[in-house]
Amino acid sequence: MLSWDIAVSRAINNAVPRVYKVLNEHPYIPELAKRLRGAKLEVLNNLEKYVEETIQSVKNNGGNAYYVHDAKEAQEIVGKIVGKEKIVVMGKSMVAYELGIRKYLESLENEVWETDLGEFLIQQANEPPSHIIAPAIHMTKERVGKLLKEKIGGVDENSKVEDMVAVVRKFLREKFIKADVGITGANAIAADTGSILLVENEGNIRFTTVSPPIHIAIAGVEKILPTLADAMIEPLVQSAYAGLYPPTYVNLTSGPSSTADIEHNRVRPAHGPREFHLILVDNGRVKANKDEVLREALLCIRCGRCHFHCPVYRAIGNVWGDPPYSGPMGAMWSYVVDGDSKPAMYCVHSGNCKEVCPMQINIPRVLEYIKNKGIHNDSGGFNA
């Protein structure tokens, strides 16, 4: 059996039953998902308004906010903030990968480290991610052990998983302490408060957002929600449908660190970052939002559930889609951000993805639409 078959079979056997268990034990989750879909549609229907509100809210909190049209603009802003010859730690961020942020910073002679375990592994292996929640899902335990033995030592293919995690934790702890800049994505952004929410299980994002003196968050405009109350729902729904409920950590950031312990007068900074920067990204999203069919892709919350129920993804893995976007949702997003219709051609329309999507996205319909545009030689995409 091929390495991919072994790895994905193990992952599916672990993940799929867990999601059904979570939904059975916490019956309020589907209702939260419906509310989240409604809140996301409200933003998409009034996108310009909510982008402007978010930017102003971030500024009100003492942070800096930017709106960028494409990867080049994003790279330029991040490059100016970071500078050269710095140590940068990154939390898992698909939009940062989409924009080529890590490679760009490395070209400026910065030392850049992925801190999510899966992202760290594929960085060391110089491979693309194979799943939006578990980027190193294509690696078996044995292969991970061999890779870590080669790169940092202390374990091998016969080591326990716990020991492999321990050596990476020890290696990255020094990077967190010395880091000049932390870069993350955002699972959700509250327009009314300028707050970002990040859900995780490892604790690396907490280090990334608190330890370095500068925190940069990069997120697509589709991550905006009307209120903080709406935004708080997203980590619950996303983690539940990923089979990782309850999430170990939910991080909320509203600007640079602050204190009000002297006369209840809030001043910044305190112990955490002295600077907070939010970069809101278009890169094809705004144009897709104007398309009645393609705007459905913008509702995706990146839970990765569609991957495990898709026969095509189970068969061929991360070769389906343009990294970091793989699987059924990745076939949609490859077109939104890259104008690439080829991934949609792999879809066999089993319909499983539609049945399990918490946002009720009709993924087969979207992919059929993209197929038709590809057949008619529409290569303009949505980032033209």
Can you say where each PLM-predicted feature lies in the sequence?
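The feature marks the mature, well-folded catalytic cores of soluble enzymes
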Residues: M1-V293
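Ferredoxin-type iron-sulfur electron-transfer modules in oxidoreductases and energy-metabolism complexes
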Residues: R268-A297, H307, V312-A384
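Phosphate-binding glycine-rich loops and their immediate beta-loop-alpha structural context
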Residues: C300
